[in-house]
Structure formats: C-alpha cells, structure tokens
C-alpha cells in the first residue's frame, strides 16, 4: 500500500465476494437456407414470430430448415441462426445492367456501396431472396405548390410536404428535403399489397446534412443505417444531374444551392420497383461447403455462446457423415462446451422398409464421442405456410427437449422419458420402432424416438455416442460437466495474475465448493472434492506461473433399466426376515 508522509486516514475497499457465476446451458445453434435475412451472420431468435420477421416465411424448398429452427423454439427461447445461400440467392434491385448483386450483411454492403452506385443501381433489397421483388421505394421530392405531395396516395403517413431543411436554410440553400416510403407492393411481406412497411420523413439529398442533434440526415445514410428492407446505392439522373443553378443530390451544401428537380417528372412521386431477386435452391447434400461455412461462425466460444448444435437435414449418408463429424470436431476439440444433436439422413428413415438398419449404418460412420447425441427419427409436421405435410429431422426437437430440461429441472437431469421427453406439435413419426428395434438402436448409441401407447411420442433413451463404457456415455453426465466446467472456468478468471499462495488457493476453494454443494443439493452430484493446495501447486508449478485445481466429481446416474420383483410368500412369514434377500 502507499504510505502517507504525514498523518492521514486511508480508506481501502477490498472485494472478497467472488462467486461462481450462473451460466446458461440451453442456447441452440442451427444453419439453414432461408428466404430472407443476413447471410453468414448469427442472429439470436427467441420465437417463431421473430424467426419469420428476421428470415421470412418459408417456401417449399427451405421449409425444412425453417421448421427445424421453429420446432426447437417450441421448447425454449434462445436459438442462434445462421443463413447460408448458394449462387441462386441474389438481392432484388432497380436500375443497372450488371448481374444481380449479392449483399450478405452490413459489412459486405460497406465494401460494395460504391460499386453498386457505379453499376447504376438506386435501391437494393436489404437481403438476398425473391422476397425483395415485392418491394417498392417511393420518393416524394420538393415540388412547386407541393403538387407531388398533395397527389401522393401515401401523404397521410407524413405531417407536411418536403421543403427546405433547417441545415440547408442555415447555409442559404433551398429545397433539399424528400420523403421516403418503403412499400410492400406485392404483398409478400404483410399479405396486403401496397402496405407501407416504413417511412422516413424530411430527409435531405445533401450529403453533409445534419439534424438538430448532429446525426446525419442524408438520405443514403439514414436509409442504410435504419431501413429494415433496402439499401440506397445512388441517385438516378433526375437527382444527380446539375442543371443551371440546380445542385445535384449527393453533394455538400453551398450557399445559394437549390436542390429542386428541374429535369424528368418534377411534380410527381418517383417509384423504384425492385426486381430480379432470387432464392437459394440448394439442398444440404449438394452444398456441404456452404453449410460448413455457416457452422464455422459458431467456432469461437469467446464471441458466441452455443450449447446445443443442431445438425441440418441431409438427404444422403455421405453428407450426414461429413457434416456431423465436422460438428463433433468443433464441439469436442475447438469449443469443448457444447454437444451436437443429429438425426439420420432423410433417405435412411423416410419411405424406406429398413429404417433401423439404415440408422445403425449411418450412426456407425459418426465419430465416437460424448459430445454427440443421435436419435433415430424424422417427424411428420404440418407446414402452415405452404399448406402441406413434411418430414423434418427429430434432432431440433430433441435439442429442444434438452433445453427445456434445463428450465423444468436442470442440465444434469436426463431429458428422456415421460416427464421431460415428450415431443410437441407433431402429426406422426417416419416410423415407430418396436421393443426389439429399440434394443438394436440403443446398443448402437442411438436414442429411440417412439410413439408409446398412452404416453405419446417420447425420447426413450439418454445415451451419447461414446462407444466405450463411461459415465460420459449418458447425456445428463456430459451436460453436467459442461455446465460445471463453464461456470468454474469463469470464476477462475479471478485467479489470473494473482499470487499462487495459500490465500489465493483458499479463496478459489471457498468459491467453488459452495457451487458444487448447491448442485449436490439439487441431485446432480453424489459427492465431490476440490484439491487446490501445495500438493498440486508445487514450487515447480508456481515457478512456471501456473495454478492447478483438481475437481473430483461423482455424477448422479439416470435410471435406464427397471426391475420389479413381485414375491409371493406364506401367510405366516415376517416380511422383515426376507426384505433384504436378493432376488
């Protein structure tokens, strides 16, 4: 501590209140082909309505990926979604003669803004997809006598006609304002043709225009920063041409500038209908590289938290093996804090006479790992967006059941069985395995999804895909350790850069033991011990600037096999005499 050179009172505050923080363990992650939304940019979704708002309603091609995401959200409210597209995915636009642009996200836009302007485009749909073809941008300029505004069918969305902004007035310039409306011309977004999606009143065509609070009021800046539907690339010739004393849109304000239109249709609304947007037509089997690129966005655990990685729907066994084994590598080697959930490929279980044998063959190609959970089925559900029945992998619902287990019990409880393992919102299964078929599946590390009379459709197994006998061959144990490891690792950050002495070690133990006692009290652990003393922090360890703690845990085990012995005895037998006999 610092010493005073004269009498003084020194006040110090010392924080010894460290605890093991609570951590979430139910965030899902999925990659898919969607109709709308940013590409290769994880978006956290909380329910199906938000999924539609962010990624659009599905068509008959991407409905499988959409509903896989939607069915996970039936059980919980945290799903990281990454959209991927193929070469058919393109943004709708107006103007220009070059091929349709592909703008994936804001970063991509910032790199291509000037190029889009040079290509002669005025407005571009925010995201790739045919949905953008439904958009129209209407711009109301200043006009003499406000004739354009007066005759505009959308003028009731604005308080007054555009004129001269305060910024231009202060610089002796005039007529720089415009109103902008983005309209659902085709009705694809709202179901109503001509519905106004968003409005932007009193914008300026001057590139340096500011509002009273100092933020940009330039039409390009405002639309590109705030619009949910379009990018503004550049102006058409009516706006960008300098004619006489008229100043061109997109230039800075000079004294005497008049931005009023003098060419083209000067007293009417400018309408920019977008076209040529395209949807991806990819199936997963033919676009493995795209899907793997999407899942790569989940690799960095320091930047994004995921707990349940849902493998996508695939049509072939080869594609399934490639994707699943790549995801297991990410979970087990790269992140070490999540599990992968997968179902067999479509062709192995839907409309086939040998789904059990096929499922076993597919599962045998996967990496043996406690970070992988495999189920056996596909779910028949109703697609309300396209009025059809479809089959989707059970994996997303299996992951949802695991996430919901966290809420109704804890991560260290088994997600299987009638209490927590019920599947929601399904019409039927691709097939229901018999008892002997369930035995075959379970021996192969596959958790049966079965329709049991009187109980409904249940997850009827809680194995991981670890081939060797171990505590980690059960889902609840694997997830217990993931939660404990994540939480204690966060608490251990407070040890960094401290001294490796008795005080620091005692403080660490004092933080960790109450956390583990709580889990023991909640039935996740039968016993534990924390070793962090001079026995494992030897002088050699200390001299290497290291700190070691050994955390020994006896995990609770789920019941998989129940035996009920019914014993008939003579009338005169004392039950106490035979109660302890093994049967």
Show the residue positions of the predicted features:
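Structured, hydrophobic secondary-structure cores that serve as assembly/anchoring elements
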Residues: 1-110, 121-122, 126, 179, ...
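Extended, beta-strand-rich, solvent-exposed assembly scaffolds of outer structural proteins
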Residues: 51-55, 90, 100-211, 218, ...
């Amino acid at each position: 501590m610092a010493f005073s050179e004269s009498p003084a009172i020194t006040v110090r505050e010392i924080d010894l209140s460290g605890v093991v923080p609570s951590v979430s363990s139910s965030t899902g992650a999925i990659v898919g082909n969607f109709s709308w939304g940013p590409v290769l940019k994880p978006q956290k979704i909380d329910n199906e309505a938000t999924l539609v708002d962010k990624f659009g309603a599905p068509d008959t091609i991407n409905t499988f990926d959409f509903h896989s995401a939607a069915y996970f959200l039936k059980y919980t409210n945290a799903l990281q979604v990454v959209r991927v597209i193929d070469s058919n995915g393109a943004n709708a636009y107006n103007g220009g003669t070059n091929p349709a642009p592909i703008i994936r996200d804001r970063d991509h836009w910032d790199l291509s803004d000037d190029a889009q302007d040079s290509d002669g485009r005025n407005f571009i749909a925010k995201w790739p997809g045919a949905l953008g073809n439904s958009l129209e941008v209407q711009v109301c300029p200043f006009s003499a006598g406000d004739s354009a505004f007066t005759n505009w069918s959308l003028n009731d969305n604005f308080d007054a006609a555009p004129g001269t902004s305060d910024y231009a007035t202060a610089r002796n310039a005039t007529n720089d304002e415009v109103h902008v409306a983005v309209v659902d011309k085709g009705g694809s977004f709202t179901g109503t043709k001509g519905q106004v999606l968003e409005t932007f009143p009193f914008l300026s065509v001057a590139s340096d225009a500011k509002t009273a609070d100092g933020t940009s009021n330039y039409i390009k800046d405002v639309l590109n920063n705030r619009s949910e539907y379009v990018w503004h690339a550049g102006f058409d010739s009516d706006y960008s041409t300098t004619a006489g004393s008229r100043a061109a849109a997109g230039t800075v304000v000079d004294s005497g500038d008049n931005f009023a239109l003098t060419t083209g249709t000067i007293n009417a609304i400018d309408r920019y209908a977008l076209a040529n947007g395209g949807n991806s037509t990819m199936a997963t089997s033919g676009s493995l590289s795209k899907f793997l690129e999407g899942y790569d966005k989940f690799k960095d655990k320091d930047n994004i938290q995921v707990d349940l990685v849902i493998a996508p729907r695939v049509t072939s066994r080869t594609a399934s093996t490639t994707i699943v084994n790549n995801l297991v590598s990410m979970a087990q080697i790269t992140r070490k804090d999540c599990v992968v959930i997968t179902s067999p490929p479509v062709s192995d279980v839907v409309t086939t006479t040998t789904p059990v044998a096929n499922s076993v063959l597919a599962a045998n190609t996967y990496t043996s790992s406690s970070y992988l959970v495999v189920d056996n089925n596909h779910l028949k559900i109703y697609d309300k967006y396209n009025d059809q029945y479809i089959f989707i992998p059970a994996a997303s619902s299996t992951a949802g059941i695991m996430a919901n287990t966290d809420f109704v019990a804890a991560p260290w409880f088994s997600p299987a069985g009638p209490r927590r393992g019920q599947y929601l919102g399904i019409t039927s299964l691709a097939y229901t395995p018999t008892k002997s078929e369930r035995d075959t599946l379970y021996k192969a590390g596959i958790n049966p999804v079965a329709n049991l009379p009187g109980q409904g459709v249940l997850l009827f197994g809680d194995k991981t895909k670890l081939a060797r006998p171990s505590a980690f061959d059960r889902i609840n144990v694997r997830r217990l350790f993931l939660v404990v490891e994540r939480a204690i690792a966060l608490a251990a950050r407070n040890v960094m850069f401290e001294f490796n002495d008795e005080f620091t070690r005692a403080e660490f133990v004092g933080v960790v033991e109450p956390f583990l006692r709580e889990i023991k009290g909640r039935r996740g652990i039968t016993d534990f011990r924390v070793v962090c003393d001079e026995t494992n922090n030897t002088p050699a360890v200390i001299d290497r600037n290291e700190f070691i703690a050994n955390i020994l845990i006896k995990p609770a085990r789920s019941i998989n096999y129940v035996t009920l012995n019914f014993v008939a005895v003579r009338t005169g037998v004392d039950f106490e005499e035979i109660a302890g006999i093994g049967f």
